[in-house]
């Protein structure tokens, strides 16, 4: 459907993307194993490449090539860099066409894989300065930043939060910036830990965190952990309410647990 209604040659956006259906992950939420998700991802990738004529890269646990395990590595260069990427032997797609033909010009590429549950989590800043958002992102993300030492050598300074990807984003419609994060393992770095660290770093730059948002769904346990951190032991409903309030999850759009918590959406509770 995305490939039918989105023409990538005319698409503009703030978030990195490589195609109309940018990424399609399979996650073992309930009654499924990671191996099963890997098999489904590879099977779908083959069909998308052969039947729809879209270049497909396999990532995460489904990656066949180790260098393609991490999504941002595949996205590097984004859609605009896809013509050159397809010419590079190291970046030939796992399935689908290897040339930037008219169909690929419209659809872009697709990244399909298997991974653990990822929380797309953005922290809102009361500044329009994207450089500040980028600096905070570099400090907190796992990969950190590359700096030049006194010898003129490039050295990587590791970030503060494990299993976290982050970048600064400017929201034109809101006139604010965000530290846009992917929490790759919320059991190691849950939302409230990322929120508090972003708040701490923001204060060093003279700006404030005003709230946050969850893009897509979130596991119930992540909210319960936040609720316990801020409010102690309460009922499930009260813990989730405390998490929503203290994380400012309704600042941009009202956070409705029944529509945002994956267990509630799937009827698992």
For each feature predicted by the language model, list its residue ranges.
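Long, contiguous binding/interaction regions
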Residues: 1-269
């Amino acid at each position: 459907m995305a490939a039918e209604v989105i023409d990538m040659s005319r698409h503009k956006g703030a978030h990195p993307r490589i195609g109309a259906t940018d990424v399609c992950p399979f996650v073992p939420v309930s009654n499924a194993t990671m191996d099963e998700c890997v098999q489904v991802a590879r099977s779908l990738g083959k069909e998308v490449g052969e039947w729809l004529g879209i270049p497909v890269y396999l990532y995460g646990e489904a990656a066949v090539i180790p260098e393609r395990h991490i999504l941002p590595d595949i996205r590097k260069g984004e859609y605009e860099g896809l013509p050159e990427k397809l010419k590079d032997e190291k970046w030939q797609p796992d399935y689908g066409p290897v040339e930037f033909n008219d169909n690929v010009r419209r659809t872009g590429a697709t990244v399909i894989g298997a991974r653990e549950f990822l929380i797309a989590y953005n922290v809102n800043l009361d500044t329009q300065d994207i450089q500040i958002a980028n600096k905070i992102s570099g400090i907190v993300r796992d990969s950190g930043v590359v700096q030049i030492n006194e010898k003129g050598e490039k050295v990587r300074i590791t970030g503060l939060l494990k299993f976290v990807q982050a970048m600064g984003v400017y929201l034109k419609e809101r006139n604010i910036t965000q530290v846009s994060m992917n929490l790759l393992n919320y059991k190691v770095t849950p939302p409230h830990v990322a929120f508090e660290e972003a708040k701490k770093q923001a204060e060093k730059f003279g700006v404030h965190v005003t709230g946050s948002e969850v893009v897509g769904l979130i596991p119930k346990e992540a909210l319960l952990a936040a609720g316990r951190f801020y409010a102690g032991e309460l009922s499930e409903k009260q813990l989730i309410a405390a998490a929503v309030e203290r994380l400012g999850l309704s600042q941009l759009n009202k956070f409705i647990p029944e529509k945002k918590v994956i267990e509630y959406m799937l009827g698992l509770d």
